[in-house]
Amino acid sequence: MGRTYIVEESVGRYLSSINLQGKTFVSGLLIGQCSSQKDYVILASRTPPKEEQNENLEHPKAKLDNLDEEWVTEHANQVSRMLPGGILVLGVFIITPLEMGNDFQNALRRLVFAVEKTLSKKRLWSFTEEEVSERVTLHICSSTKKIFCRTYDICDPKSSAKPADWKYQNGLSALWISFECTVHINIHIPLSATSLSYSLERNTKNGLARWAKQIENGIYLINGQVKDEDGDLLGGQKKSFKGNAQAASHCFDVRVLTQLLLNSDHRSTATVQICSGSVNLKGTVKCRAYVHSNKPKVKDAVQAVKRDILNTVADRCEILFEDLLLNETPEKKVMKKEFHILPHRVFAHVAGSTVMLCDYKFGDESDEEIKDHFLEMLDQKIQIKDLEIAEEINTGVIAAFAVCSPCCGYLLSLLQ
């Protein structure tokens, strides 16, 4: 038996409202949350059209090659930055005027694998063996209104399509459980002489991977308590929520305790390497995560928070490096020491849901630009007055880059 996708009714209305307007197809992303029993789809977002794109009314089958994998995967990459912990890209949808054959299904298969491959490259974490590895493709025929829902196991390159159920539900995420966490980071990434041949971005990502292990191995206090990860998150509480007062109480505060010293049973040896510079990240980040309200486990909450911490730091660094590349001056060849403020996080509600999506904002960007970005990437109209700035400017993360001559210092590293 295939997987079941429980879908917010507003997603169905959104998909039905998409007008092909002479195009041979419209593609997009399906966004939500996985669980062991079923998956939840809370949002769909069409792929933004390319500026130079000029569709005509040729027969759809002649246009299969126009399914631009690179464009769709870049959209998925941008959207993934806007998702809080626990929310991810579940798959892709495509709307066509006609029912299509096997060639088209093969194109969809390639697309869903390409999206997952792109997203996995940037993650500082990996899926566990227990997690669902199936991703969904949804094909809607606009003329017959037929829906073809199939899944593929993205861990198996030879995976074949499996049929899946697509069921709508009103108010799906209206009472989901939210988690808020403030993390103070102070990450020092030394640059050895041998690592200078790599880009600063690559060196930073390698350093973040080491920091990620601290976050993965941390102790997580939920409302000040350490809970059994296999226990029910809402153990001892009412299972049904009636009224906003009870629903509002299900926002948990999470604190992270990371290990500073090695345990006594860990043996280590010290090595000395020539240090040619360093990258330092210091400041405070605000994290949010969401879990469905269908008998969630403590481990579901902890995992969602962990991943939001890792994602938001990695995404901010990636955005900063993209900005530096765009604004690079040709005459600037040697960097001695620089300070940059990483972009701040801004949240906005999804209509009819407790879930808030996010974006990142540099100090010189306007709220209007953030509003436009939500519309372009997520096809979501938001009000500027509803934007919630997560971090104040004076508490955000500052990145300090210092690249010196190869003989200016030494790196002492502990090897376990």
Where are these regions (language model features)?
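Active-site beta-loop-alpha substructure in enzyme catalytic cores
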Residues: V92
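C-terminal functional modules of predominantly eukaryotic multidomain proteins
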Residues: C155-Q416
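N-terminal beta-strand/alpha-helix entry module and adjacent surface
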Residues: M1-L88, T96-S199, N203, G207, ...
